[in-house]
């Protein structure tokens, strides 16, 4: 856990957490940093554990490693028989590896099982000032708590399991400030899509981003997680938000959060985890929250995004020939014509879920749109809670009944249709309003067409059969 720095040089939040975790700086080599929490799942861990077995190594700190099953699990049944042969092998291998190495596992039958980036925070595994890694690109989610969190590759997973450390080069720093407050109908998802639309999908490359400003401070922890989750979609190494009372209120009493006197001591230390006055960033981006409308992607990367009241962009209006060619290619794949109002774009599939938008606040937002209405004819819509805890809470609030009565399918926790890795996938030609984080070609299935939106926008599209501006009656 990070302790307050005694240095008088103003530092950014990232610099404070980084400095507290550097354990060695070998000459001519990348620094070695300590890892506080290591999250693993069934897809990127098998080879790492296998490498340990071949080398005869044990885990350096098994109590700091937490495992779950999420990417390849079924959202229709908790039975192993519901899995494909490959998926079954992966989850069974993870279970055996966790048993062999003494790792805590939240398997498909555990009430707290879920998407790794949903489950970790709600259990209090994610804490301010910690370094968190996982073999998954959306590990940046945990940065919402003031943690330095980022995805790693399988060889690095093995290295962390064996040493609880990692070689890392220090990143540059970027401040993204969202000033003022958003208007009704605009959510955290719209904020982060607007940011990516402004700086592009590579605008954050080489940086750790700190999100700040009144609009970010006003977000719940669920909203902050949505924003940090998509830091990777702007090319950033990680995204962070300074912890505050909202953070502390969320964490207090959670299973792995400090208790008693340790809690008071932890909060005192966490309050120092903010960028100092006078600290310098390598880059700064500013947005006015009042200018942000509900967003949706029109192309094949998260940076190809527009406001709901805008038309499909025209490549001919783009001066840069490389960007123009990319736009033309995207429109050809996505099957849209420049100038078409986004509200005229019909969909036949809706996915509400993923590590971006499957928390209780997300489901409440979607249910508000669905209540008393019916899914449009020809539309298939599924709602996938991010964890067992989210599912139980949603059911206690009656959200499942709202969705089911409206014609949505209510599923078990898992990564589901975010990626075409399990049985929840799109067919060629399907057009999906999705609350996930990536709209690449084939991401949700070969030939599939994905539009990234907020949970409210996705639910509204399911009802209308096409995209709508949720700020207006429909």
Swiss-Prot record:
One of its GO terms (biological process) is L-leucine biosynthetic process. Heterodimer of LeuC and LeuD. This is 3-isopropylmalate dehydratase large subunit. The gene is leuC. [4Fe-4S] cluster binds at residues 355, 415, 418. It catalyses: (2R,3S)-3-isopropylmalate = (2S)-2-isopropylmalate. CDD domains: IPMI (cd01583). It comes from the Bacteria.
């Amino acid at each position: 856990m990070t302790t307050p720095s005694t240095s008088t040089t103003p530092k950014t939040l990232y610099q404070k957490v980084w400095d507290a975790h550097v354990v060695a700086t070998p000459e001519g080599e990348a620094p070695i940093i300590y890892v506080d929490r290591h999250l693993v799942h069934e897809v990127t861990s098998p080879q790492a554990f296998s490498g340990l077995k071949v080398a005869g190594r044990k885990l350096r700190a098994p109590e700091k490693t937490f495992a779950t099953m999420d990417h390849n699990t079924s959202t229709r049944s908790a039975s192993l028989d519901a899995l494909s042969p490959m998926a079954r092998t992966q989850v069974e291998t993870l279970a055996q590896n966790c048993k062999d190495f003494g790792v805590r596992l939240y398997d498909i039958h555990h009430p707290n099982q879920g998407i790794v980036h949903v489950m970790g925070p709600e259990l209090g595994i994610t804490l301010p000032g910690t370094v968190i890694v996982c073999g998954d690109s959306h590990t940046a989610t945990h940065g919402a708590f003031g943690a330095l969190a980022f995805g790693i590759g399988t060889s690095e997973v093995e290295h962390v399991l064996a040493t609880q450390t990692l070689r890392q080069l220090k990143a540059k720093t970027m401040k993204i400030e969202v000033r003022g407050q958003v208007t009704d109908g605009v959510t955290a998802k719209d904020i982060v899509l607007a940011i990516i639309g402004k700086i592009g999908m590579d605008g954050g490359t080489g940086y750790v981003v700190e999100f700040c400003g009144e609009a970010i401070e006003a977000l719940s922890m669920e909203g902050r997680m949505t924003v940090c989750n998509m830091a990777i979609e702007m090319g950033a190494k990680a995204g962070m938000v300074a912890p505050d009372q909202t953070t502390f209120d969320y964490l207090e009493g959670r299973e792995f959060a400090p208790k008693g006197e340790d809690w008071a001591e932890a909060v005192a230390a966490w309050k120092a985890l903010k960028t100092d006055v006078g600290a310098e960033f390598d880059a700064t981006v500013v947005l006015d929250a009042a200018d942000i409308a509900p967003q949706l992607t029109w192309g094949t990367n998260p940076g190809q995004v527009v406001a709901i009241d805008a038309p499909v962009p025209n490549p001919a209006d783009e001066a840069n020939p490389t960007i123009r060619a990319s736009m033309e290619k995207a429109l050809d794949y996505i099957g849209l014509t420049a100038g078409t109002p986004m509200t005229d774009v019909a969909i036949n599939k809706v996915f509400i879920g993923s590590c971006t938008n499957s928390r209780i606040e997300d489901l409440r937002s979607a249910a508000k749109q669905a209540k008393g209405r019916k899914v449009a004819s020809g539309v298939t819509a599924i709602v996938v809670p991010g964890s067992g805890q989210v599912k139980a809470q949603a059911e206690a609030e009656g959200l499942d009944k709202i969705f089911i009565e409206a014609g949505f399918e209510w599923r078990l926790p898992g990564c589901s249709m975010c990626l075409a890795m399990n049985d929840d996938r799109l067919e060629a030609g399907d057009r999906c309003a999705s609350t996930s984080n990536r709209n690449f070609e084939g991401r949700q299935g070969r030939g599939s067409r994905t539009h990234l939106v907020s949970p409210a926008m996705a639910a509204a599209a399911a009802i209308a059969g096409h995209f709508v501006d949720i700020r207006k009656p429909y």
